[in-house]
């Protein structure tokens, strides 16, 4: 799916496979995870009108192209939800950080033996840094929106995007739930399962 050049303010998501370093201890398992991640991302973006992106190693970069800011946010949340739901079916969890700001995609630069996408902009950098070293540390399965630089939005009409605990820097998107009334029970199950590491987290996300 070719991506045309883009330059403007939009929402950008940085997503990666949780626990990929552990998966890399077995080349076959790591390769299977990567292949499924890429295929899932390709299928979701192919069927999504307003979100584009690409995947490199264990990471994906998504951005919304058209519409007002509310539409852009809803579009990227929907894509993230679909990718996460398909990944969790194979017991793979993702972490996803979303930011708003400038984003510049300059197409594909081709060199012999390698392909590189030129991407620049505050939104991409902010999403990447939040995913890698944001505080509190993002946990497996989580998708969160960085509040810094957010435009005016009608958050009340996105009931599964909420503030969480004492974290004043983010809003969390509960992609796996259907009703905000389920959030409190999920959080309890997630905390209780954390000691079981990834197996327990997967069970909580699937419940």
Describe each model-derived feature in a short phrase.
Residues 1-2, 9, 135-207:
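Intrinsically disordered, glycine/charged-rich C-terminal tails and inter-domain linkers
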Residues 66-67, 125, 148-153:
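Catalytic phosphate/metal-binding cores of nucleic-acid and nucleotide-processing enzymes, i.e., regions
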Residues 75-78, 93-95, 122-125:
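Short, well-structured alpha-helical interface segments that form or flank functional binding sites
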Residues 54, 58-62, 92-108:
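A short glycine-enriched loop-to-beta-strand structural element that forms part of the catalytic core
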Residues 82-97, 129, 137:
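Aromatic- and glycine-enriched beta-alpha-beta binding-site module
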Residues 100, 122-147:
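Catalytic/regulatory signature loops of cyclic-dinucleotide turnover enzymes
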Residues 107-131:
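Catalytic-core segments of nucleotide cyclases and related cyclic-nucleotide turnover enzymes
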Residues 1-85, 89:
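Catalytic NTP-binding/metal-coordinating core of nucleotidyl cyclase/transferase enzymes
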């Amino acid at each position: 799916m070719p991506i045309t050049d883009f330059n403007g303010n939009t929402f950008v998501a940085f997503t990666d496979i949780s626990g990929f370093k552990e998966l890399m201890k077995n080349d076959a398992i790591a390769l299977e995870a990567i292949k499924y991640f890429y295929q899932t991302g390709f299928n979701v973006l192919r069927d999504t009108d307003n979100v584009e992106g690409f995947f490199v190693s264990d990471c994906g970069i998504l951005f919304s192209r058209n519409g007002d800011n509310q539409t852009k946010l809803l579009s990227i949340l929907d894509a993230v939800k679909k990718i996460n739901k398909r990944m969790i079916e194979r017991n793979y969890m993702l972490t996803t950080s979303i930011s708003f700001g400038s984003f510049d995609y300059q197409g594909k630069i081709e060199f012999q033996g390698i392909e590189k996408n030129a991407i620049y902009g505050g939104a991409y950098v902010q999403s990447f840094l939040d995913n890698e070293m944001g505080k509190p540390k993002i946990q497996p399965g989580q998708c969160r929106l960085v509040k810094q630089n957010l435009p005016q939005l009608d958050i009340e009409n996105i009931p599964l995007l909420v503030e969480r605990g004492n974290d004043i820097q983010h809003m969390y998107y509960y992609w796996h739930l259907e009703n905000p009334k389920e959030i409190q029970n999920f959080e309890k199950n997630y905390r209780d399962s954390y000691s079981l590491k990834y197996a327990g987290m997967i069970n909580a996300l699937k419940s």
